[in-house]
Amino acid sequence: MMLFFSSLYDWLPGVNVFRYITFRTVAAMLTSGLIVFLFGPSIISSLKVRQGKGQPIRADGPQTHFKKAGTPTMGGLMILSGVVISALLWGNLFNIYLWVSLFVMLFFGAIGFYDDYLKVTKQTDKGFSGKARLSLEFLVASIASFIILQVGSPGLALPFVKEYFINLGWFFIPFSACVVVGLGNAVNLTDGLDGLAIVPVMVASLSFALIAYLSGNINFADYLQIHYVSGVGELAVLLGAVFGAGLGFLWFNAPPAAIFMGDTGSLALGGLLGIVSVATKHEIVLIFIGGLFVLETLSVIIQVGWFKLTKKRVFLMAPIHHHFEKKGWTESQIVVRFWIIAIVLALIGLSTLKLR
């Protein structure tokens, strides 16, 4: 919206700065962060009153989690509110990538909200039917992937390789849908400790903001020999808003958390990162930048698969952050060490931009 005022620079000195993606990205960060920080306390109070007992605690989980009883969930509403308002204020409202990404984020958030609602009202850790939930997620992701295919190419870029793309054809749609749904649920699995998921999400958002900016600039894309995608640079503004909202949310989600993100936030943010990786043609790089989420998901797959084969467990509990809880690590140790892993993996992912 503010981009409109840049056309009035002859009458309003200084508004020309609104043309620059870098300026609007920083402005989006500050705006979303301020929104979440200022309105967070009232939202938390409202959710606490409405939810009563708060998010139910798993009976088979670590004993230390029972002290979290009564903590409200659906904190993703705070994040999504800040992101949407900030993105609409500072983003280019004529950019298709912005709208497709918001579409995925909000619909995944709605699915997560319904899941949280069922868990809170029924006081059970079993929410929305798994099959129904996945079906809706794949439907939303497929629609978004189809739209991106209409405005872009069906190519899959490979890191470390110069100017080589695999033409996926119509297979681009199911492949992209799997990326979006996979990451949405991967972030959801990671969100099991206070502050554990939000910082890696912020790290990934900042990393993909840089990738989107470079991929959307023909000069930088040519220099780095990465796939140029016209208009995708606008996603840097949206991802900047995610980073800012994440900072605001971390203020309340830091141990001991005053509120949990819930499926409302984790599904929405994971789905958003997934569709951004598709739009920027960096789906494979997502494996590195979102590496912590991948590791958490793999731990669940390994645990379930091995148990079905041998009736034995590889980990004391999955996802893997619970394994370390059972090993005696404190929650703060796990969270901070996993943050470090997320940052290192993101740096490795960003290094692929130059290593070709």
Curated annotation (Swiss-Prot):
Entry similarity comment: Belongs to the glycosyltransferase 4 family. MraY subfamily.
Function of the protein: Catalyzes the initial step of the lipid cycle reactions in the biosynthesis of the cell wall peptidoglycan: transfers peptidoglycan precursor phospho-MurNAc-pentapeptide from UDP-MurNAc-pentapeptide onto the lipid carrier undecaprenyl phosphate, yielding undecaprenyl-pyrophosphoryl-MurNAc-pentapeptide, known as lipid I.
GO MF annotation: an example: UDP-N-acetylmuramoyl-L-alanyl-D-glutamyl-meso-2,6-diaminopimelyl-D-alanyl-D-alanine:undecaprenyl-phosphate transferase activity
GO cellular component labels: plasma membrane
Pfam family, one: MraY_sig1
Annotated membrane topology: Multi-pass membrane protein
InterPro entries assigned: Glycosyl_transferase_4, PNAcMuramoyl-5peptid_Trfase, PNAcMuramoyl-5peptid_Trfase_CS
GO biological process, one term: peptidoglycan biosynthetic process
The encoding gene: mraY
Principal localisation: membrane
Enzyme class name: transferase
Protein's cellular compartments: Cell inner membrane
Pathway membership, UniProt: Cell wall biogenesis; peptidoglycan biosynthesis
Cofactor: Mg(2+)
Protein name, as recorded: Phospho-N-acetylmuramoyl-pentapeptide-transferase
Entry's transmembrane regions: 25-45, 70-90, 93-113, 138-158, 164-184, 195-215, 232-252, 258-278, 284-304, 333-353
Reactions this protein catalyses: UDP-N-acetyl-alpha-D-muramoyl-L-alanyl-gamma-D-glutamyl-meso-2,6-diaminopimeloyl-D-alanyl-D-alanine + di-trans,octa-cis-undecaprenyl phosphate = di-trans,octa-cis-undecaprenyl diphospho-N-acetyl-alpha-D-muramoyl-L-alanyl-D-glutamyl-meso-2,6-diaminopimeloyl-D-alanyl-D-alanine + UMP
UniProt keyword annotations, A-Z: Cell cycle, Cell division, Cell inner membrane, Cell membrane, Cell shape, Cell wall biogenesis/degradation, Magnesium, Membrane, Metal-binding, Peptidoglycan synthesis, Transferase, Transmembrane, Transmembrane helix
Record EC number: 2.7.8.13
